[in-house]
């Protein structure tokens, strides 16, 4: 086998593994972004723990088929970049959606969230969700509210008794 074919097979295997391992994968068309805008986007994604790569569509198609995500192939036309996140489902959608609001050249095409193909509208809906940490803090405040209210009520009763006794 030639060295070129071996290299391409390694890339296909790498993409397929990333597709299988990632909780969230978003495909975007980056045509029209300047170098500085693309660098800014990569920096924002890196800070959010998201990997952003450009692969050849033919290699990505083969990888999607081997990862049993062949439905993604219809979106692999033109210049594409793929954002992979192994930790946070919301992070790539949020960063890409926020960046696309300010830079019309970036077009979100589709995504795969936990193995399920999602459309542009679904990606935008996911982008509006709070992050995992945000959801946990909301849950924590909801769980603490009854205890806090009980403590405040007890303190109010104690203050009232103290006033009556004085």
Curated annotation (Swiss-Prot):
Molecular function terms from GO: large ribosomal subunit rRNA binding; structural constituent of ribosome
Transmembrane regions listed in the UniProt entry: none
Ribosomal protein found in the keyword field: yes
Record carries keyword rRNA-binding: yes
GO CC, any one term: large ribosomal subunit
SUPFAM superfamilies for the chain: Ribosomal protein L10-like
GO biological process: translation
Lineage: superkingdom: Bacteria
Key words, A-Z: Ribonucleoprotein, Ribosomal protein, RNA-binding, rRNA-binding
The family this protein is said to belong to: Belongs to the universal ribosomal protein uL10 family.
Function in brief: Forms part of the ribosomal stalk, playing a central role in the interaction of the ribosome with GTP-bound translation factors.
Assembly information from the UniProt record: Part of the ribosomal stalk of the 50S ribosomal subunit. The N-terminus interacts with L11 and the large rRNA to form the base of the stalk. The C-terminus forms an elongated spine to which L12 dimers bind in a sequential fashion forming a multimeric L10(L12)X complex.
Protein name: Large ribosomal subunit protein uL10
Gene: rplJ
């Amino acid at each position: 086998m030639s060295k070129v074919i071996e290299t391409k097979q390694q890339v296909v295997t790498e993409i397929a593994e990333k597709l299988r391992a990632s909780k969230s994968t978003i495909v975007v068309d980056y045509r029209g972004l300047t170098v500085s805008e693309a660098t800014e986007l990569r920096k924002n994604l890196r800070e959010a723990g998201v990997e952003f790569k450009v692969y050849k569509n033919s290699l990505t198609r083969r990888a999607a088929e081997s990862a049993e995500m062949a439905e993604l192939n219809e979106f692999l036309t033109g210049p594409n970049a793929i954002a992979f996140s192994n930790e946070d489902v919301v992070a790539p959608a949020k960063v890409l959606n926020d960046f696309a609001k300010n830079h019309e050249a970036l077009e979100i095409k589709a995504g795969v969230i936990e193995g399920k193909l999602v459309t542009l509208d679904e990606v935008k809906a996911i982008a509006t969700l709070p992050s995992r940490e945000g959801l946990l803090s909301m849950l924590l405040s909801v769980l603490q509210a009854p205890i806090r209210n009980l403590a405040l009520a007890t303190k109010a009763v104690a203050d009232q008794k103290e006033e009556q006794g004085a």
